[in-house]
Amino acid sequence: MDSTVVIEPAYNALSDVRALFEAYTAMLVTHDPAFQIYLDIQHYADELRAPAAKYAPPDGRLYLARVDGRAVGCIALRRLDGERCEMKRLYVQPQYRGRGLARQLIRRITEDARQIGYRCMLLDPLPVLEDAVRLYRQLGFYEIPCYNDSPVESTLFFQLDL
């Protein structure tokens, strides 16, 4: 039997968002403890308390991926300025990876970014996220110079022209 996959706005399921954000950030801090400093710079504790505020329409977005009703992935979009936005918090639970969910989440957020009127989307993954980095490249993201204040030396910086 095929699973039912739904990509939906997450504003009415913030407890699911928080759980996925926590799993995502725990994974990153495990790979590089310096990532905790970056989370602090980003005021992550505030974001976790009120995730909808940072990613609210009309300039932002927040989505969940559900498989058979279960929240298994997330993605967010935030405004940097009038022409640039940033993809944040792309995460799919390990047992659901390899099913194309990350690709679906990215497609949804890039469609929204185009509709909002952004000209490009930026993101700053860690190289340890090899599968994600490979996917970003496949989807047309390319490396750019540093665009933020990440203290994690290994951070990569990508852009997608919309």
Where are these regions (language model features)?
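Conserved GNAT-fold acetyl-CoA-binding loop/helix
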Residues: 5-11, 22-51
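A short helix-loop-beta-strand connector motif used in the catalytic cores of GNAT acetyltransferases and
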Residues: 47-64
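A conserved beta-turn-beta hairpin within the catalytic core of GNAT-like acetyltransferases
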Residues: 57-58, 79-88, 97, 116, ...
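Conserved beta-strand in the GNAT
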Residues: 64, 70-79, 86, 91
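Conserved acetyl-CoA-binding loop-helix of GNAT-fold acetyltransferases
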Residues: 92, 98-111, 134, 138
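Conserved beta-strand-loop-alpha-helix junction that forms the acyl-donor binding cleft
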Residues: 94-97, 122-132, 149-154
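Conserved GNAT acetyl-CoA-binding A-motif
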Residues: 113-125
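Conserved acetyl-CoA-binding loop of GNAT-fold acetyltransferases
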Residues: 118, 137-145
